[in-house]
Amino acid sequence: MHILLNLSLISVLFIGCQQIVQSNTNQNFSDILKNSPRIEGKQEYLQSPFSTTGNRVYMVGHQDGTFPDLGWHIEGEMGGIWNHPIKLMDGFDIQITEASESFKLNKADKFTNYPVANVHSFSWKDKKLEIERWQFVPDDKQGLVVQLIIKNHGKERNLNLKFTGHPDIIPTWLGDETGMEDGKDQSVFDSEKKLWKIKDDLNEWYALFGNDKETSVEKTSLNTLEDTISLKAEETYVINYVIAGSYTSEQEAYATYNDIKNNMNSYLTAKRERYEELANRSKLTVPDKDIEQVFEWIKYSCDWTIRTIPEVGSGMCAGLPDYPWWFSCDAEYALKNHMAFGQFETAYNTIHLLDSISEVTNGNGRIAHEISTNGAVFNKGNVNETPQFVSLIWDLYKWTGDINFLKRYFPTVKKGLNWVMTERDENNNLLPDGYGMMEIEGLDGEMIDISAYLQRAFIDASKMASEIGDNKLADEYKTKAIALKEKINSVFWSEESKSYGDFIATDEQALKTIANAIERAEDMKQPWVIEELKKKKKYIKENPSSEIRAFAIYHSYVVNTPMEMNFADEDKALIALETAKKFTSQFGVYVTGIDKDTREDTNNENVKRESAFSYESAVMPMNAGVLAVSENNYGRPNEALDYIKKATTTFSYAYPGGMYEVSPDFGMMNQTFNNYAYGVPIVNQFFGIDPQAAKKKVVIKPQMPDTWDNASLENVLIADNTISVYYTKSDGLLTLRVEQENSDWEVEIIIPKKDNINSFEVTKSSVEPEIVDGKYVFDSKASTTELVLKYE
C-alpha cells in the first residue's frame, strides 16, 4: 500500500509517545488463563503459521513472532490482521531498547497455544528479561488485544518500548466483483486519543491502534508508539496494545477500540468460560488419550473458523490462511460433527448463509461452492454439493426436531434435487454428470461421489417429505433412492480394481482420462504413477468393452462413498475396504490413491511439504474420516479406530492445537472439515447415538473398538435433552449406563445378542428388554438406565 500523509498533522508524525509508568497491577492474560488447557509448539516449526481467531477478526503470523508474506489467493496478503471483508494490517514489530542496545521480538524461544489465546515467549538473556507477547480476539468484536508481559530478573532498568504497526487496508478476494476499490492509506496520529488512525482514502475503511498508557507526544516516526518504563528488580510490567477497525465508519472503529480497551479482561474471561462450555459438551473419556485430547481441541477449532460478516452472514469457513470464507462441501462434511459436538448455532447459521447466497446466485436449488466474504461467488457449485446439502438439512433436523427449520428449507431441497436430475442428467439414467469432490481435469462425467451422495439425498428427502406430510413425494424420492442403490452397486463396481470406480464411462472416455492423468503425473514427476496408468491403459485395450463400465483410474478416496453412505452391497464393501488400505500412509488416506509410490523401498512416510502450494501426493485427515465412517458402517470399529489414529498423528504436528489440511504440515494450518474423523465416527458410531429429536427419542446402539473397554461420552446435546453414555467391558461383563436430563424423552438401547466376536446375555437391567431381529431392545424414560450383559 502507498502511504498518504495528512499534511495538516505532519508535525506529529515525528513525535513520540513517552511517559514513565509503573507496573500495571491489573490481572494479566496469563493469570486469567492459568488453569486453561494449552499446547506448546515445536522448535522446528517456530517459522510456520499460527492464528489468533475471533468470529469477526483474526490474526495470522508465524510462531516466532514475525509476520512474513503468506498465502496465494491474494498473493502474500493472506496473513496479518483481517476484519473481513477488509484487511487491517500486515502485522507489527515490537522492539525493546535499553540505552544503545535493542531487542526485537521476532525470534521467539517458544510458542504456546490456548483455546482462546496464544503467547510467544522471548528471553533477552543479557538483560535478564523475560517477555511474553499474548494476543486474543474478543467475541463479536472488530479488534484484538496484544499484551506484553515483561519480567525483570535483573537490576532496575529504564526501557523504551517501540510498537510499529504496518497498516495495509485492502479488500478481500473478489472484492472488485462487488465494487470494492482499493485506495491509498492515510495515517494520522490522534493526539487526543493517543492512537494511530489509518483510513483508506476511497472508502470508509479504518484501522486504529494504540495502547492503554497515558502517553505524551514527542519524537517518533510514522505508525509507531513509544513508551518509556522504569522496571525494578523482580518487577513485572504489563502493557496492552489494542487494534481495531471498521469497514463502515470511523465512529464504529473508535467505539470498538474503546470498548475493547476498557473491557479486555472481562471479554477474555467470558470467552474462556464459553470455551469451557464447548469442552464440556460431548465430553469424551477413552483409553486413547491422544484421541481424547484431539476430540477436545477439535471442538475449539470448530469455533476458531466461524466467520461473521453481518451484511453477508455467519458460518464456518474452510480454513486459514487461504480459505477464510465459506465452502459448501466443507460445511457439508464438517457440520455433521458440529451437531455431534452440540454446536447447533454454527450449523443453523452456515446453512442459512449457503442457502441465501445460493438462491441469489443460482435461484434453482443449486448450492454454491465457494463464497468470498463480500458475498461474491467464485464457483456456482459442484454437482455433489447440492445433494450433500439436502442431507445436511435432515441431519440437523434429527438433532433439533425443529419442524419450522425443515419447512423453511424443504423448498430448496426440492429445487436442488430437480436441478440435479433435469440439468445434470442429460441421458436420464439417474447418474448425473459433472464435477464432484475431485476437481481434476476430466473428472466431470458420471462420478461415484455425486451418485452416492445423491442416493443418500433421496433417502433423506423422502423422510423430510413424510415429516411435512407429502407422502406422494416421499414415495417418489424413495423409489429413486432404491433404484440408485441398485444401479450404483451394479455399474460402478470394478472387479478388476476390487473397488468402486472413480467414474463410469466408455473405453474411449477412460483412455482419454488416462492420457490426462499421465500428463498430470509427468508434470508432478511421478514415474510410479505413469507406470501404473500404462498398466491400466493396457488392460483396457486388451479387455475391451462396448458397454459403459466403471474405472478406478485415480483411485481417489471418493471411491469409498458407497460405504460411507452405507448402501454398498456387503460383499463388495468388505473387498473395497481392504483395497482402500493400500492407499494409506501413517497419516491417513491419499486424496488420489495413485499418488502413493508403491515401489519397493519407497518411504511414503516422508511427506513434509517444502514446495509451493500444491496438493501433490496429498494425504488428508478428512479422508481418513470418510474411511472411518465407512468401516463403522460395516461393523468394523477396530479398523475405523485405525483411521482415526492415523488422522490423529497430524494433530499438533506443526501447529499446536491444530490439524493441517494436508498431513502432516501442508496447506491450511487448520481445516474445519478435519472434524469428520472424530464427530460422526465416535459420537454416532462408536457410542451409537442416533438422535430422533422430533420424536423426543434417542437410539443408542454402541459398537466400540476392542481397546476401548472403558469409555464415556457426557453431555451430548439433543434438542432440549442432554444424554451421557458410560461403557465398560471387563471380566466377561459389559456394563452400559445411559443418563438423560429430560424424562419426557424415550431412550432406546440396542445390543446384538451376538456380534462378530461375542454372544451376549442380559444379567441385570433396570428395564426388561424385548428381542427384535436377534437384538436386545431396551426402552426407557428413566433419568438413568443401566444394564449389564455377560459376554463370551
Per-region residue spans from a language model:
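Acidic/His metal-coordination segments adjacent to aromatic residues that form catalytic metal sites
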Residues: T308, R366-K380, P432-M447, N606, ...
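Terminal accessory carbohydrate-recognition/targeting modules of carbohydrate-active enzymes
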Residues: C17-P287, M669, I689-E792
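Active-site lining segments of carbohydrate-active enzymes
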Residues: S314-W325, K336, N364-G381, E385-V390, ...
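Active-site acid/base region of carbohydrate-active enzymes
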Residues: S191, L278-S301, F341, E345, ...
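Bacterial N-terminal signal peptides
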Residues: N6-G16
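Asp/Glu-centered strand-loop micro-motifs enriched in Gly/Pro and often flanked by an aromatic residue
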Residues: L70-E75, K107-D109, S123-K125, E132-F136, ...
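Low-complexity, Ser/Thr/Pro/Gly-enriched N-terminal "stalk/linker" regions
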Residues: V21-S51, N203, S249-Q251, M264-P324, ...
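Active-site core of glycosidic bond-cleaving carbohydrate-active enzymes
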Residues: P324-A347, H352-E359, P411, G445-A452, ...
